[in-house]
Amino acid sequence: MKDVVIVGALRTPIGCFRGALAGHSAVELGSLVVKALIERTSVPAYAVDEVILGQVLTAGAGQNPARQSAIKGGLPNSVSAITINDVCGSGLKALHLATQAIQCGEADIVIAGGQENMSRAPHVLTDSRTGAQLGNSQLVDSLVHDGLWDAFNDYHIGVPAENLAREYGISRQLQDAYALSSQQKARAAIDAGRFKDEIVPVMTQSNGQTLVIDTDEQPRTDASAEGLARLNPSFDSLGSVTAGNASSINDGAAAVMMMSEAKARALNLPVLARIRAFASVGVDPALMGIAPVYATRRCLERVGWQLADVDLIEANEAFAAQALSVGKMLEWDERRVNVNGGAIALGHPIGASGCRILVSLVHEMVKRNARKGLATLCIGGGQGVALTIERDE
């Protein structure tokens, strides 16, 4: 099979819920990244074979949002596109599918990633087609129902985080300390300009003025142990998971340009990283946050690595309790994990996050001259994904 490489990796800044990017649809955000990948790699738009983008919240977004992003991003009508929904893992699963297409010879060049605008997710009147006859009708929040609700146990996906906290003995104090560390690392990374190379600025209008959004909006400058300790539990009055030690609701997009190594050589493009292996797993939905343990183990087994061989890890921080449980099970070196902060600080635009962590991983590996990297996420509904990449020595 063909070797698959990444030659471009970009993302938008991550916007707060109803924040600076709220006025831009997921398609607008995704198209900006698609366009920037073409411009920065100088790959002819017509040479792209397919676009694969994750998006979870598609109610009211129009037909096939990935196709919209491809065309709006400057690709010709001849380039096909598909939108996928693997919940939080969508953006990384897109890379799995792109890798398979290239390995099998069905494509040479694929743009893969994810996009989401959680701020614009509509409320849905589910009985409007048939009529309510008598009585009231209920509006369903598609953001929660389609993105954050466990369909099997009929509860918020924060409840499995509480389950993990109890199962693995993760205290409130440990969760808050983890969250504070994520905030501090993200703020230090922003101040040091660690994300500049990976971010595509977004132009937006505010009070008649054009603003350039080029920095992640979510990380807090006022995060403190005292402030985190004052927050009430969000899902269980006697629980430990709060808004402060969980990821947030956000807007953003991320994508990578992938191709066969032979095509990269033919186009004289520098290789940022090689795809080495990927894995998807399923677990009990009530313990969905532990799935990265099994996805990581399967992925490492496929490539023949030990966890100690991996130089940098990006593991999505859905919840501090979840991240700590995974770390406890895998016994990884915390100094190699989310070195610039994670989703608790940076945010979690669900359809985009899988690719966002991969983009950040690639760029940090380049900066540190690291060789081996791992990206992994848990997925609402009881799944996990992982992907390993390697850079040439």
Please describe what each predicted stretch is.
Residues 10-12, 22-32, 40, 174-266, ...:
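N-terminal extracellular/periplasmic Venus flytrap/periplasmic-binding protein-like
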Residues 84-116, 159, 165-194, 255-262, ...:
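Active-site-proximal alpha-helical scaffold in enzymes
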Residues 24, 55-110, 152-156, 222-248, ...:
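Conserved catalytic cysteine-centered active-site region
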Residues 1-24, 36, 139, 224-290, ...:
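Condensing-enzyme catalytic core mediating Claisen C-C bond formation in acyl metabolism
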Residues 1-61, 65-73, 80, 160-172, ...:
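Conserved active-site "lid/cap" helical segment
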